[in-house]
Amino acid sequence: MERKQKNSLFNYIYSLMDVRGKFLFFSMLFITSLSSIIISISPLILAKITDLLSGSLSNFSYEYLVLLACLYMFCVISNKASVFLFMILQSSLRINMQKKMSLKYLRELYNENITNLSKNNAGYTTQSLNQASNDIYILVRNVSQNILSPVIQLISTIVVVLSTKDWFSAGVFFLYILVFVIFNTRLTGSLASLRKHSMDITLNSYSLLSDTVDNMIAAKKNNALRLISERYEDALTQENNAQKKYWLLSSKVLLLNSLLAVILFGSVFIYNILGVLNGVVSIGHFIMITSYIILLSTPVENIGALLSEIRQSMSSLAGFIQRHAENKATSPSIPFLNMERKLNLSIRELSFSYSDDKKILNSVSLDLFTGKMYSLTGPSGSGKSTLVKIISGYYKNYFGDIYLNDISLRNISDEDLNDAIYYLTQDDYIFMDTLRFNLRLANYDASENEIFKVLKLANLSVVNNEPVSLDTHLINRGNNYSGGQKQRISLARLFLRKPAIIIIDEATSALDYINESEILSSIRTHFPDALIINISHRINLLECSDCVYVLNEGNIVASGHFRDLMVSNEYISGLASVTE
C-alpha cells in the first residue's frame, strides 16, 4: 500500500476519534506499553528470587527476598489488572468510534448520487459498514495490543538478557526477530490477498441472502425453493472454498513460525541447560530464559497472522473509504431559491442513453412555465420517466442542457434542487417507523397540526374507518397499509414541502379516479404557482392539463391540448377509445 494511501487511512481512523476517543486510544497504548515492560521484567525478578533461595547469591537477606517477592506479585497483579482495564477502554473506544463512523457513513450515503445508491441492496450496504467497522476495530486492537505488546516484550527481553551478559541468548533473540520479520514480510502479502478475497465473497453472500429475503414472496409464489436454495448454496460453497485457501496458507505460516521458534528458542534453551550443568549459568538465569521463551513464543508466532490481518483490513478499509469518500465540492447555490418561488423550465437538445446502443431520449427540447400543468404520455419505454428523472437530478450523464430560470441544472446543488423540485414516484419509500417520522421526512419542524392538515389534503385523515394516529408503526415497506394509503403518505409529504416544480410520475396510480381527481385539485389549489409535470395514461388527468406531450422512442411526436390531440394523434385517440 502506498505511503500516501496509508496516511489517508490513518487520518481517516484518527478523524473518527473525538477528544474522549483520543484519550481512550492513547490510554490503551500507555497501558499496553507499561504492562509489557512490567511483564518483561518479571522473569528477571523470578530469577533473582530463585538465586537467593538456591544460595547462588552471597548477599542473602530476608528483606531483599520479601521486596523481590512483592515486586513479582505486583507484576502478576498488574498484568491481570491491565488486561481488565484494557478491555474496558477497548470496548468504550469501539462504541465511541462506531457511533461516529456510522453517522459519517450515513452522511456519505445521503450525499451520494441517487444512481449509485440504487446499485447495491440494503444487505450489501449495511454489511459494508459492518465490515469497515470491524476492520477499524482490528487495526486499533492489533496496533495497540497484539503487535505492540510482543514487540516491546522482545526489545525488553534483549535489553534484560544483555544486562546479564548472556551474549549468546541475546544474539539468538535478536536473530529470531530479524529472520521472523524478513520471513513474514514476504508471506503476509499473500495472506492479506487471500483474506481480502474471502471477505469480499462473504460480503457478496450476505448481499445475495438479503436479495433472497427481499424477493422471498416471488420465490414462494413460484414454488422456487430449490432454485433459491441452490443459488445461495453456490455462494456459500464459494465462500467456504475461499476461507479454506486462506486458512490453509495461514496454517502453513503458523507452522513455519513455530518451527523457527523451536529451532532458535530451542538452541537458547539447550545452551542454558548446558550452562547450568557446567556451572557457568545459575538456576535463576535458566528459569529467566525459559520464562522468556514461554512468554514470547505464542504471541510472537501469532504476529505473522496478525500482520496479514492488518494488511487485509488496511486494504479493505482503504477501498471502503475510496468508495464512500464525502464529496466536499460545493455546487453554487441558486439565488432565487430564497427569493422567487416561481420557476420556468427550459430543455434544450436533451439526449440520454443507458448504453451506447440506443438513445432513450433524442434531442428533446421544450419550454414549461410556472403555474401550468403539463402531462407526459406515450407507450411504455418511450422515455417519460427517464426525462423527469433527469429533470429531478436522478441522472447526471446527459447531453444537452436544462435550465431553471436561465440557470443550468448542472450548476445547481442537489440540496437546492430538492428544495425546488418535488418528485412523486410510484416508489413509496416507507420507513419502518411511525407515521409521524415518515411525514417529518418532508419537514423536520412540522407540528402535529400541520401534519394532520396535510393528511386531510391527501385523504388520509381516516384509516379503516378510524381517525389516523401519528404513532401508528409502519412495518417493512409500509405493508400494513394498502397501496393507495402508501401513495397518500407520499402525497402528504408533498404538502409539507414548498416546491416550485412538482413532478408526478404515476404516483396516484393506486387511487381511484375520484380520489385521484380530488388530490390533483388539492395540489393545484395548494400550489397555485407551481409548474406541474404529470406522467399518466388516464384520460381525466390528461383532460385537465394545460398541455399534453406525447413521447415515442425518445422523441416528442405530438403536443397540444388533449381535445385537439384526440383528433390528430393516434395514441391519444386510442386511449380515449379504450376509456369509452
Curated annotation (Swiss-Prot):
It comes from the Bacteria. ATP binds at G378, P379, S380, G381, S382, G383, K384, S385. Keywords: ATP-binding, Bacteriocin immunity, Bacteriocin transport, Cell inner membrane, Cell membrane, Membrane, Nucleotide-binding, Plasmid, Protein transport, Transmembrane, Transmembrane helix, Transport. It is found in: Cell inner membrane. Residues 345-578 form the ABC transporter domain. GO terms for biological process: bacteriocin immunity; bacteriocin transport; protein transport. The chain crosses the membrane at residues 25-45, 66-86, 143-163, 167-187, 261-281, 286-306. Residues 25-312 form the ABC transmembrane type-1 domain. One of its GO terms (cellular component) is plasma membrane. SMART domains: AAA (SM00382). It is a multi-pass membrane protein. Homodimer. Belongs to the ABC transporter superfamily. This is Microcin-J25 export ATP-binding/permease protein McjD. It comes from Escherichia coli. The lineage of its organism: Bacteria, Pseudomonadati, Pseudomonadota, Gammaproteobacteria, Enterobacterales. The gene is mcjD.
